[in-house]
């Protein structure tokens, strides 16, 4: 889990609130301070140098992200798996293969998208992520979003969607809806859906995931 030290990275959480529009759409509004010369390379260096992250201090490998530095679609997962740690890249193994097929179904190649996770490391002992570790990682994720500046964000799985949107709803309640993230001077739609690893276990949810993918396709056409 990549931790966070505000004085080192220059990223500090700011105003946080939700705005409910007349049509019921939820806008998540946040402000975060970033270094003037921020970049994916700088964010990755800050992740690896984090003094508060137990995983980083223990020398756990970091899985930061993959894809073009400017991408129309940004895909955010929960945290790296064993296959990801071995390769240093997110969404490897069977779940990654399914994700590739999902993207191909809406005429997108993996190489066109920026992929990352909320959590950047596997915790020592491969235990579950703590709330503190998730919060330590979150500012790095927001900086990644600002750097990539995607047109659309897909949040895969409950942890990714809940962390990004500050929601306590389940992924089944969140999916199928388009949220808006207003981050500093940027505004982008966020669409939560099921994690491919979950779809491998619960195949009957693939129909709902396909409905979500069609919505992503429509958002990218706008």
Please describe what each predicted stretch is.
Residues 1-222:
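A polyanion-binding, active-site-adjacent surface
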């Amino acid at each position: 889990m990549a931790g966070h030290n505000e004085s080192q990275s220059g990223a500090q959480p700011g105003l946080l609130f939700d705005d409910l529009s007349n049509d019921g759409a939820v806008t998540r509004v946040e402000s975060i301070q970033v270094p003037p010369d921020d970049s994916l390379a700088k964010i990755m260096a800050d992740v690896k140098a984090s003094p508060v992250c137990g995983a980083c201090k223990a020398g756990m490998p970091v899985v930061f992200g993959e894809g073009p530095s400017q991408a129309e679609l940004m895909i955010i997962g929960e945290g790296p798996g064993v296959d990801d740690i071995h390769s240093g890249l997110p969404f490897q193994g069977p779940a990654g293969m399914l994700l590739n097929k999902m993207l191909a179904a809406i005429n997108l190649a993996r190489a066109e998208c920026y992929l990352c996770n909320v959590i950047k490391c596997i915790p020592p002992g491969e235990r579950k992520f703590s709330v503190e570790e998730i919060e330590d990682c979150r500012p790095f994720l927001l900086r990644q979003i600002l750097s990539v500046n995607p047109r659309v964000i897909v949040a895969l799985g409950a942890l990714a969607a809940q962390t990004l949107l500050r929601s306590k709803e389940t992924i089944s309640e969140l999916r199928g809806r388009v949220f808006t993230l207003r981050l500093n001077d940027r505004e982008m739609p966020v669409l939560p859906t099921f994690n491919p690893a979950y779809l491998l276990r619960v195949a009957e949810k693939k129909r709902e995931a396909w409905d979500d993918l069609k919505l992503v396709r429509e958002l990218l056409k706008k």
